[in-house]
């Protein structure tokens, strides 16, 4: 029973870490990366479709993304969707494909993105702590219902505390790497 609670908590903490990685992927670092366009939705036959569903996004060089639509007639819609996505990107339409130059980040935007990264990391920390609280609550309930002994509860609590320390260290490391990446000129 304790192992099930621990395993469930671990799975949920992994999902929080994956969510953090996804959030970090959405934050521009000054280098071209396809995940920057991950949130762009393109109107496709009356339905908003992710950009990856209507075009290939590749890195042409360290400062340029190349977007090649699967259907040539989608080029205008893709151009408009990227321009209006609030990413501060201006695609260049070359007739068959779009090129997106990454503007160098100013010190001010770097600091803004660093704040964004810290906020995402804090959200992940809060999520992990909430998972810990839920798991410890389940252990207390099992003890109260006399399904496990107090010693087993303490052992389970110690295992969950060790787990949270590991995940908080991973969050701190990921945040530090992202901040270093953002502040590199």
Swiss-Prot record:
<comment type="function">
    <text>Responsible for the release of ribosomes from messenger RNA at the termination of protein biosynthesis. May increase the efficiency of translation by recycling ribosomes from one round of translation to another.</text>
</comment>
<dbReference type="InterPro" id="IPR002661">
    <property type="entry name" value="Ribosome_recyc_fac"/>
</dbReference>
<protein>
    <recommendedName>
        <fullName>Ribosome-recycling factor</fullName>
    </recommendedName>
</protein>
<dbReference type="InterPro" id="IPR023584">
    <property type="entry name" value="Ribosome_recyc_fac_dom"/>
</dbReference>
<dbReference type="GO" id="GO:0043023">
    <property type="term" value="F:ribosomal large subunit binding"/>
</dbReference>
<keyword id="KW-0648">Protein biosynthesis</keyword>
<comment type="similarity">
    <text>Belongs to the RRF family.</text>
</comment>
<dbReference type="Pfam" id="PF01765">
    <property type="entry name" value="RRF"/>
</dbReference>
<dbReference type="GO" id="GO:0005829">
    <property type="term" value="C:cytosol"/>
</dbReference>
<dbReference type="InterPro" id="IPR036191">
    <property type="entry name" value="RRF_sf"/>
</dbReference>
<keyword id="KW-0963">Cytoplasm</keyword>
<dbReference type="GO" id="GO:0002184">
    <property type="term" value="P:cytoplasmic translational termination"/>
</dbReference>
